[in-house]
Amino acid sequence: MAAAMNLYTCSRSFQDSGGELMDALVPFIKSVSDSPSSSSAASASAFLHPSAFSLPPLPGYYPDSTFLTQPFSYGSDLQQTGSLIGLNNLSSSQIHQIQSQIHHPLPPTHHNNNNSFSNLLSPKPLLMKQSGVAGSCFAYGSGVPSKPTKLYRGVRQRHWGKWVAEIRLPRNRTRLWLGTFDTAEEAALAYDKAAYKLRGDFARLNFPNLRHNGSHIGGDFGEYKPLHSSVDAKLEAICKSMAETQKQDKSTKSSKKREKKVSSPDLSEKVKAEENSVSIGGSPPVTEFEESTAGSSPLSDLTFADPEEPPQWNETFSLEKYPSYEIDWDSILA
């Protein structure tokens, strides 16, 4: 009866500390060598049942100071209750292990909630504006569509934002670099100037309404020189070489036509001479082939035997003149 009263008072003293201490003491209680009596075992099992204890409510965002300092009293309480339950043989290392299992840090719930609340109030990340990409019509994180840039002929954008103008030469189809520009319109004007120099009025221009005067382009904005002087000089040299090759092609074609015209009168004169000779002589001139075939025809040289004449056999013909090693002619003729 006294043991039961001691266990009851011990259980009342442990209710304030919670059920975590008893969960940590369960494996050590089972390994105790001294087995208690039946009455003390029944009371101990009733004492260790988890329904006999009620966990204190965990503090919210602002924990109480008494709750934080409460686990430090478990070491002194453990030595007092060890004699009641039968844990006198626990070593100091085991006691420290139990204390380390009990002293868990509190979950930082208020810190996480504050972080989530600050994430809701923080601005959304936005991508940088990409003006050269035609497909990026919408910016990331914004519902307002961005204005797509116009694409020009012979113009492309570098990945760092600059614009480059290039043109293909009509002869060998190679690309000629025209320069790097800050805007797409400047690069398009440079392409128009180069295309007009190479192809003239047949060029396809980005701005066909502008007028081209030498190396300048005129419009409502005034006179503008889009190409660099070195690029302009290179274009002039290319245009001169193209003009020279065109002149050479035209000269070769005209010379071929003249050769055809010179050769055609000679043939006509030969035909006319032959016609005149036929009309004067009355008969065409005899060729060498006709002269060779006129003397004798190939049919006159052929001779055929008369089928009515009997064949002439030689009666003195004997087979002995033609001996053979396989046939015995003496036995045959005997």
Curated annotation (Swiss-Prot):
The keyword Ubl conjugation does not apply. Residues 243-317 are annotated as: Disordered. Residues 151-208 bind DNA. InterPro entries: AP2/ERF_dom, AP2/ERF_dom_sf, DNA-bd_dom_sf, ERF/AP2-like. Mostly expressed in roots and leaves. Also detected in flowers and stems. CDD domains: AP2 (cd00018). Keywords: Activator, DNA-binding, Ethylene signaling pathway, Nucleus, Transcription, Transcription regulation. It is found in: Nucleus. GO terms for cellular component: nucleus. It comes from the Eukaryota. Residues 261-275 have a biased composition (Basic and acidic residues). Belongs to the AP2/ERF transcription factor family. ERF subfamily. Probably acts as a transcriptional activator. Binds to the GCC-box pathogenesis-related promoter element. May be involved in the regulation of gene expression by stress factors and by components of stress signal transduction pathways. This is Ethylene-responsive transcription factor RAP2-4. It comes from Arabidopsis thaliana. The gene is RAP2-4.
